[in-house]
């Protein structure tokens, strides 16, 4: 396990280093790039030194430090993605297991139909439908922002729920409820696609495990169905799914850009799209580096967690030697 972890960490370092060339190219080879006047080597050394010290330069649009802007928008996107990812796991894992143990029955067919429908709906269309019905027509939920305009929440961590909870305002409970109400529509919109994929992965894994002899032997010993599902099916069906969850998080980070634009969510995706519109290449380079690094780190962590849950995974390399 130690060798497997070290191998993944080395892969992480190499991949992040290669990613720096992508970010640097946006600051050097594009028209009106900030580093275009210097030689290639000197420009890369200067840019890489700034990257190490978390200095991405200043925006060509408003003159503000890009690092300060990232500190404001990055927590908003992470809060949205974490909540949506948690919702996808809470719903997708049990529903996928139900579909797996009831395969070819009406429960399985119904779950597959709903999952296929959710997977096929474009994110922007789903966001517009939820906005139309839940906000504009019924007036249940707000359509944009993170808080009501009545509340002024001091940014401490950048996470709306945590900042509202840490606030010493007498209206703290109302601030928390306002933050929750503003998150419901974006979280639902963002969680639909990964939820359907988790359902599909969990269904396939459950079917494979449910046909194993040790599951049938547990049933012949008189164990209850709940005990069999908890001890044998879930314990063995979940580890193969864990390494693939990193890809779902990466996909969700991409979908967050569209979600943030529709709901005017002040996050990294909306900030990056605005930078692309305004051709702010220094900001684009910083956004690409942050998003790419996050995707790589999450995938490596999911691989390591998958190997910890399934010891056979990190032995595959030795079996191929």
Swiss-Prot record:
Molecular-function annotations in GO: dipeptide transmembrane transporter activity; putrescine transmembrane transporter activity
Residues of the ABC transmembrane type-1 domain: 74-302
Cytoplasmic topological intervals: 1-8, 102-112, 196-248, 302-321
This protein's UniProt keywords: Cell inner membrane, Cell membrane, Membrane, Transmembrane, Transmembrane helix, Transport
GO terms (BP aspect): peptide transport; putrescine transport
Domain of life according to the entry: Bacteria
Keyword Cell inner membrane: yes
CC terms in the record's Gene Ontology section: ATP-binding cassette (ABC) transporter complex, substrate-binding subunit-containing; membrane; plasma membrane
Gene disruption: observed consequences: Single mutation, decreased extracellular putrescine, in an sapBCDF operon deletion no change in resistance to antimicrobial peptide LL-37. Operon deletion has no effect on growth, but if the putrescine importer PuuP is also deleted then growth is slower.
Subcellular location: Cell inner membrane
InterPro entries reported in the protein's UniProt record: MetI-like, MetI-like_sf
Family stated for the protein in its record: Belongs to the binding-protein-dependent transport system permease family. OppBC subfamily.
Task performed by this protein: Part of a putrescine export transport system, does not play a role in resistance to antimicrobial peptides.
Protein name from the UniProt record: Putrescine export system permease protein SapB
Phylogenetic classification of the source organism: Bacteria, Pseudomonadati, Pseudomonadota, Gammaproteobacteria, Enterobacterales
């Amino acid at each position: 396990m130690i060798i497997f972890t070290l191998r993944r960490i080395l892969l992480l370092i190499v991949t992040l280093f290669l990613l720096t060339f992508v970010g640097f190219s946006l600051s050097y080879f594009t028209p009106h790039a900030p580093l275009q006047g210097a030689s290639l080597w000197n420009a890369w050394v200067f840019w890489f030194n700034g990257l190490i010290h978390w200095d991405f330069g200043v925006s060509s649009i408003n003159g503000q430090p890009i690092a300060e802007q990232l500190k404001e928008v990055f927590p908003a996107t992470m809060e949205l993605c974490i909540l949506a990812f948690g919702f996808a796991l809470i719903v997708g894992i049990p529903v996928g297991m139900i579909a797996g143990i009831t395969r070819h029955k009406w429960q399985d067919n119904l779950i597959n139909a709903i999952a296929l429908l959710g997977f096929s709906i474009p994110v922007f269309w789903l966001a517009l439908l939820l906005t139309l019905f839940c906000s504009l027509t019924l007036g249940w939920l707000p359509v944009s922002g993170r808080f009501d305009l009545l509340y002024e929440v001091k940014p401490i961590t950048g996470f709306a729920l945590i900042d509202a909870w840490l606030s010493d305002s007498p209206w703290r409970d109302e601030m928390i409820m306002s933050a929750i109400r503003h998150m419901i529509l974006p979280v639902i919109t963002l969680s639909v696609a990964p939820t359907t994929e988790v359902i599909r992965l969990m269904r396939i894994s459950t079917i494979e495990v449910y046909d194993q002899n040790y599951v049938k032997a547990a049933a012949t010993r008189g164990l209850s169905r709940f005990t069999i599902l908890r001890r044998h099916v879930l314990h063995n069906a979940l580890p193969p799914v864990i390494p693939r969850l990193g890809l779902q998080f990466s996909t969700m980070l991409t979908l967050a850009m569209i979600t943030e634009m529709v709901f005017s969510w002040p996050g990294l995706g909306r900030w990056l799209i605005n930078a692309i519109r305004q051709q702010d290449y220094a900001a684009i380079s910083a956004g690409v580096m942050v998003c790419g690094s996050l995707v790589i780190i999450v995938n490596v962590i999911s691989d390591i967690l998958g190997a910890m849950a399934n010891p056979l995974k990190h032995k595959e390399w030795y079996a191929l030697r």
